[in-house]
């Protein structure tokens, strides 16, 4: 069994939903601080218990007193299963969000600082109120913000950066993948193809990143207004001889209008 790094204050609480991500980060940290990754680890051991009645409990098996704790969870990971009343259920974002909150509570305020790393922002599309509905994303962030030990919340490609307005104490770090996508396009696609790109935004959700691509490649674009009564259009005259790239913000359900935005070109 690996030993905890003793002379460093940093610790990782890695839930099973983010197991691979946590191991990669642990390996990089050990390499950075000069520890043998075969003997040491920054990951504290925990038990994740799902009970037959649907309740859950997180148990921490090592002390976190005075530590800078980073909790890693992937609420979009539905591959995990648990048994409830004789049925096998896949974990939902709600299950994993409650597990995260239980893990924070298990720290018992002993950690010096608590940081949350959540690649997919929970309820990220519920960022504004249109009718009689709940602002779940902002409510969760505000609830975490009220914990005096919370230092930062880290996510990637949030649907709307404006959700950070719901918090006042902890930091909200939102990292975009746009630059990485541009680097891979330049590296993997030949120059003649890059000159003939056309970027497509099926609704208003991805117009921001689409504009970054347009400015980078000086390309043309196609945009379908959200809520348009026209579902199918013929865009062949726009993409004839071009290489279309569909830029969308989120594929959350089978009914998504953007999935009906299909381009075919000769």
Regions found by a protein language model. Give the residues of each.
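PRPP-associated nucleotide enzymes
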Residues: 1-266
């Amino acid at each position: 069994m690996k030993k905890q790094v003793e002379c460093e204050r940093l610790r990782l609480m890695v839930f099973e939903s983010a197991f691979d991500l946590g191991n990669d980060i642990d390996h990089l940290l050990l390499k950075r601080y000069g520890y043998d990754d075969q003997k040491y680890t920054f990951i504290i051991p925990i038990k994740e218990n799902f009970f037959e009645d649907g309740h859950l409990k997180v148990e921490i098996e090592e002390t976190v007193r005075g530590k800078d704790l980073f909790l890693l969870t992937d609420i979009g990971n539905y591959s995990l299963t648990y048994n409830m009343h004789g049925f096998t259920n896949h974990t939902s974002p709600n299950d994993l969000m409650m597990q995260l909150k239980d893990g924070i509570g298990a720290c018992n305020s002993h950690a010096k600082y608590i940081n949350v790393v959540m690649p997919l922002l929970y309820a990220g599309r519920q960022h504004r109120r249109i009718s009689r509905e709940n602002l779940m994303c902002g409510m969760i962030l505000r609830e975490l913000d009220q914990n005096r030990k919370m230092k930062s919340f880290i996510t990637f490609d949030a649907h709307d950066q404006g959700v950070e307005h719901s918090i006042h104490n902890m930091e909200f770090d939102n990292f975009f993948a746009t630059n990485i996508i541009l680097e891979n396009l330049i590296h993997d696609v030949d120059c003649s193809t890059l000159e003939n790109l056309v970027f497509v935004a099926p609704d208003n959700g991805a117009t921001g990143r689409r504009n970054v691509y347009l400015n980078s490649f000086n390309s043309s674009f196609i945009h379908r207004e959200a809520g348009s009564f026209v579902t199918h259009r013929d865009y062949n005259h726009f993409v004839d001889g071009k290489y279309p790239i569909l830029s969308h913000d989120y594929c959350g359900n089978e009914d998504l209008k953007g999935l009906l935005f299909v381009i075919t070109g000769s």
